[in-house]
Amino acid sequence: MIENWPKKPEGSQWTDDQWKAVVANGRDILVAAAAGSGKTAVLVERIIKKIINEENPVDVDRLLVVTFTNAAAQEMKNRIGEALEKVLIDEPGSQHVRKQLSLLNKASISTIHSFCLQVIRGYYYMLDVDPRFRIANQTENELLKEEVLDDILEEEYGIEDNTIFFELVDRYTSDRSDDDLQRMILALHTESRAHPNPEKWLDKLVEAYDVEGKTIEDLVYASYLLEDVKFQLETAEQHIRKATELAMLPDGPAPRIETLQADLALLGTLSSAAHESWTSLYEAMQNVSWQTLKRIKKSDYNEDVVKQVDSLRNKAKDEVKKLQEELFSRKPESFLRDFQDMHPVLEKLVQLVKVFTERFQAMKRDKGMVDFTDLEHFCLQILSEQSENGEMNPSAVALQYRNKFAEVLVDEYQDTNFVQESIIKFVTKDSESEGNLFMVGDVKQSIYRFRLAEPGLFLGKYKRFTQEGLGGGMKIDLAKNFRSRHEVLAGTNFIFKQIMGEEVGEIDYDADAELKLGATYPEGEDVAAELLCIQQTEEEVIDGEEGAEVEKAQLEARLMAQRIKAMVDSGYEVYDRKNDSMRPVQYRDFVILLRSMPWAPQIMEELKLQGIPVYADLATGYFEATEVNIMMNVFRVIDNPMQDIPLAAVLRSPIVGLSDEELATLRAHGKKGSFYEVMSSFLKGAPLEEEQELHDKLEWFYNLLQGWREFARQQSLSDLIWKVYGETGYYDFVGGLPAGKQRQANLRVLYDRARQYEATSFRGLFRFLRFIERILERGDDMGTARALGEQEDVVRIMTIHKSKGLEFPVVFVAGLGRRFNTQDLMKRFLLHKDFGFGSQFIDPRKRIKYTTLSQLAIKRKMKMELIAEEMRVLYVALTRAKEKLILIGTVKDANKEMEKWLDAREHSEWLLPDHIRAGASCYLDWIAPSLYRHRDSEMLLELGQGSIPDEIYGYDTSWKVEVVDGNTLLAPEPVQEEKQELLEALREKKAVPLESERKDEVYDRLMWKYGYEEATSHRAKQSVTEIKRNYQSEDGSDNAFIKKLRAPIKTRPRFMEKKGLTYAERGTAVHAVMQHVDLKKPITVEVLQEQIAGMVNKELLTFEQAEEIAIEKVISFFDSDLGKKVLAAKSVEREVPFTMMLAAEEAYQDWQGNSGESILVQGVIDCMIEEEDGITLIDFKTDTIEGKFPGGFEQAKPILEDRYKVQLSLYAKALEKSLQHPVKEKCLYFFDGNHVVNIEE
């Protein structure tokens, strides 16, 4: 079958492996695509080749393409569409290609959740679900869970003789709350839903604790821990062997050798026992006895070597002591008793989880909603059926999908979970050797385990499949990287060849996994990768862990700011592939990658201080924003005014504006009771004269508050929020503060959040406040409104997770000295997909607790998985760089850390010892030991090659390794220091001598006058109507502009307003009719009535406006000479908008500024008739004429001419400028009285 694959065309851009991935067929195929290897292009090309295959073309809707995100799915569709359009250019007559383009929008190219949704919509009748279901909001989901769980526990507490439940409560709750028990139930529910059969997985948890008739050797936990014990004993042996080598040196402590050999024999005995059984090792551990070291005269030997030997021996003894205390201080039978004792309690816990799942599903069903895990499980339910022996087999629907899909292609396969794998399995062929499943991914970039992704699925197939595809699936390695320079790739390879292995890291970083150069770059300067390790001296360290973290962030931020500024200022060059040339680096070429975002605000602040534009999509800080915080307190007070802290916050805020003294005065009126009660009491009495202002402020707020509370009971939450914004004027107020637009955007987001909340199944202010609390509890704070867009020339800061799939010319990876987050390992209970449930053994009667075997096994397993995940995260970070990679980390004591890292230099294999890699607590613990074995670290270490093999020491990679003194970074710059001194002098109101060389410049700045002061009182943009009014005013000033700054006059309440349209609204209605009336139809009452009715239907007019139209006046116009001219004309334009620049002195009579100033003028011309000899301009007027002027129209005419002369002159000027055609006639038509006025110049 391989021979039948199309051969790669001559001169093809594809590599051999890429071409194989494009055309290989006839079996399941796994493509291991390294970073930057062009996997998306390969995937698209494979799809195109299948669609346009001459012998066996496949319709695009017979392919299922599963992507990780909706954006990736859309990009895939776009790429396929573009490729098909290119084919169509070469084959314009191809009906097949045209058909594929029409099918593309309906093709199954989507995320797995979108596919599930499609299946459920098609077969909803097979489920107990409302076909009109909606996807639940995450916070709404959490609140529903809380509600269901509260009900279940309340019922359980009310059952008499519920012994096991109360034992469960005693073991896993505190005396204050049952929060821990609730967390356990929810965690078990969530974990179970990551498995195809949640109930089966839960049952296995309970079965694991039923140890009746079993020995400790039968337990999976003991088997796993024994492997770990072997690992630790091997580490202890390595320490003793290293100590022995040192003792044998010419100046080493030779008398120690005999003792060390005895130690090796002891460790050998323990290791042999570990290979036999747990019981054998337990017995051996009881007989451990270390020989006492012989006294030696230290002056006879090298003191440093003696210290190293003794230190290494103590490390080995500590390893064994730790094992003795954790695992072998208790008899094997006592561990079994723990399991048996916990079995009924765990059984009860699992029963509660099952009840919770059932009730939660029922509540969602009643509310017509589903969550994302439901989509997967409902889809699986449709696609599978259970056999008699409990196995899941494909259903009739699944078989239909199997027949429909010619191939299923899965992108980012390494991030698939067990449920998704089952769904894919049911819509593809059974046999891997004859399968139709094409999977693309890179297990080294699997970094979503926290979302329950399972990299083991990829690894299992990678180990099982062969490159030839004989007897099973085929694997193809795409190792060529078309993104990065040699220096980036070689640097990454050098580190990962040393740290990533199967035992520690889950993946062998072998020759197949290494990145291979595929991109071509011109020679560049300063392209070596860098490791900058900042030494944080004792003087710099702020007390407390949090303070130290802030200090580290500041140090690294300052170093990065200096480097970025230096690179930009020096014109550092990067390659522009589009233009095939080098160009100076821009800010947008830099990215700063962080493991998580807590440091981002400090880094942003430091970069801004250096004048570097920076952008970070911060998912925090929204609810901390002052304006949002104040508004949230207002809503808390509306919900419950008896809350003192929120009420005091609102009273002190700009909304009420009390000072500290006024707040104290209010409290002095009632030392007992809540602030609200004191305020109510204060308002009932007559205020003292000096308290009148305080009384007025509180009375104003109190009346508003009562109105809001009443409104909240009857109206929607979103309406309440906007009402509060409007009545307090707070929305407008924050708009006038610095960053006003952003603050207003934050308030609008709060309003939008309320509308989203109202779209859920919850209602009311109280539940909304709880809704927000849940968001904050989950750590899902939103980012504040964006001030800088992502496309601007800015340095970007983002998490490594967010950067996946992106690339940047220059990459800083910062925070490499931060400790890995191991909080999950510290929880009171642990869960694992394979090992189930583990917690401490708690005996409430004896008041004792201790670690169990299951907890130790799960903790160790999770630690190793965490280490592997962090390695993959580091790999993703390093492979984002195209041209320059700079790694930065901070340590408290560089000398001490170096001593630890230098241990790696004694190791002669590529892969560092397991204990070094598994014992890492931060990324630097992997990177530094690796680089300290390379020749480029010599400038720092000056230790020579030593025993490091040539292939490692001289590996073809370029690095700059440097330790940076933190003191030099924190030293104030001279300018800043001078500035600080000046500020301090000014605060103390001292005279400041201007000794600076720039004193003349300072004087000039202080005495400077704005050269365009006249322009500040006149608008730069005017409408024609405003210019007309301006000419009519006495002094020509822009009163309308100034009026906007005046306090508004309160409008009457609506119930007191007179009904009917205003003059302006009537005029607008008439103009609308004149714009839309059909000039080709006869102008009669019936025709006009019909047309006006049509305008109402199209919402061009309101019903009220239509009622006010005087149809006879419209007919009168068309009966006039001017109207007949309009009807007879060949070219008539109506409602013609225009914009033009006008000299300021023409627009403003009082203009005294620069003669070169211009303003932008906008207007709309009602009607124009274009004829060969010129344009007739018509402006319709609805002014009242009849009865207003005693002298009739003859008196009105000169007044009207004067009033509108400027307006029509501007219209004429605009038309003549734009159309290059003269205006021969300017007419005003007044509907009141059917009058025409010709405006002459």
UniProtKB/Swiss-Prot annotation:
It catalyses: Couples ATP hydrolysis with the unwinding of duplex DNA by translocating in the 3'-5' direction; ATP + H2O = ADP + phosphate + H(+). Its cofactor is Mg(2+). This is ATP-dependent helicase/nuclease subunit A. It holds the Pfam family PDDEXK_1. It comes from Bacillus cereus (strain B4264). Heterodimer of AddA and AddB/RexB. Belongs to the helicase family. AddA subfamily. ATP binds at A33, A34, A35, G36, S37, G38, K39, T40. Residues 505-805 form the UvrD-like helicase C-terminal domain. GO terms for molecular function: 3'-5' DNA helicase activity; 3'-5' exonuclease activity; ATP binding; ATP hydrolysis activity; double-stranded DNA binding. Transmembrane segments: none annotated.
